[in-house]
């Protein structure tokens, strides 16, 4: 019984070794970063709504400054996944009474 177990374990180890020791032909994924060196800007329209413009689809605008400021510049960064929406402007509500 022990000999059968050892033989089965050895066979399994050899199969696993063969499967994972082969060198696979891989092609590195080269993603063109459309967000590199792209700046974005947050502005407020006359109705008090914040707008973020400047980043292409699939990029996230990271603003440089506190959230309390309305007009800020930022940098676009590539997201891990591309959103289904193709809009490049984001609107946020802004309460002028605060």
UniProtKB/Swiss-Prot annotation:
Q: In which tissues is it expressed?
A: Expressed in salivary glands.
Please give the Gene Ontology molecular function terms for this protein.
Answer: toxin activity
Write out the GO cellular component annotations: extracellular region
Query: Transmembrane segments in this chain: where?
Result: none
Report if keyword Disulfide bond is assigned.
yes
Disulfide partners: 35-59, 40-61, 55-76
Q: Which residues form the signal peptide?
A: 1-21
Q: Where is the protein situated, by its record's location annotation?
A: Secreted
- Key words of the record: Complement system impairing toxin, Disulfide bond, Secreted, Signal, Toxin
Superkingdom: Eukaryota
Family statement: Belongs to the RaCI family.
Q: What's this protein's function?
A: Complement inhibitor. Prevents complement-mediated C5 activation by binding to C5. Binds C5 at a different binding site than the other tick complement inhibitors OmCI and CirpT1, and the drug eculizumab.
Q: What is this protein called?
A: Complement inhibitor RaCI2
Specify the species: Rhipicephalus microplus
